């Protein structure tokens, strides 16, 4: 009987481990490295990522920000854990709220609406952080190309952003998607 209980325990435990949310920092760093390379060499990627050659990408060097990375990791974890995909969490809060809550300085008017998001791009169900960046830069079926503009700094707002953090989470079961990626690009003391 004792052996049967042990076997039953391990059998049940094996299913529970598959629903654990895992933060993968290596995938986040790989995504960051690719984004930097795309921004530095856009013509190298224009065919693969479906944008015109000679695209005027922001020349501002993005700096990894540990605070933004922790927020991005928390968001990727939360989406996997609570099984949603969106810029506003189930409690109605957007990314600007969480950035301000972390101590990262934002203009006060950017946090008056609790669902506001000026700094976040999201991807889901990609096999890697690199694929997440590819999907977001391609921005297929997004007429405004908002993710591309955000990640590559293609307009005056996004071109001024300097700090970046990326979170990549995995969950084998228990959520709609197996992976969630959150990319935050902002500017400290804006």
What are these regions (language model features)?
Residues 3-13:
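Sec-dependent N-terminal signal peptides
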Residues 94-190:
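A well-ordered secondary-structure block
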Residues 20-106, 160-163, 169:
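Short, well-ordered surface patches within globular domains
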Residues 8-9, 39, 151:
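Hydrophobic, Leu/Ile/Phe/Ala-enriched alpha-helical segments that form helix-helix packing faces
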Residues 15-19:
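Signal peptide cleavage region of secreted peptide precursors
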């Amino acid at each position: 009987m004792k052996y049967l209980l042990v076997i039953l325990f391990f059998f049940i435990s094996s299913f529970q481990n598959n629903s654990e949310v895992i933060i993968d920092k290596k995938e986040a760093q790989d995504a960051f490295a690719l984004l930097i390379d795309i921004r530095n060499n856009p013509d190298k990627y224009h065919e693969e990522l479906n944008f015109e050659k000679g695209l005027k990408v922001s020349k501002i060097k993005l700096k990894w920000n540990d605070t933004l990375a922790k927020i991005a990791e928390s968001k990727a974890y939360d989406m996997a854990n609570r099984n949603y995909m969106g810029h506003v969490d189930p409690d109605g809060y957007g990314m600007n709220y969480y950035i301000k809550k972390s101590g990262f300085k934002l203009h006060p008017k950017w946090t008056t609406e609790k669902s506001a998001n000026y700094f976040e791009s999201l991807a889901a169900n990609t096999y890697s952080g690199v694929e997440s960046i590819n999907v977001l830069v391609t921005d297929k079926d997004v007429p405004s190309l908002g993710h591309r503009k955000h990640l590559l700094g293609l307009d005056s707002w996004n071109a001024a952003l300097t700090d970046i953090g990326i979170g990549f989470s995995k969950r084998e079961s228990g959520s709609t998607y197996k992976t969630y990626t959150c990319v935050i690009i902002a500017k400290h003391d804006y």
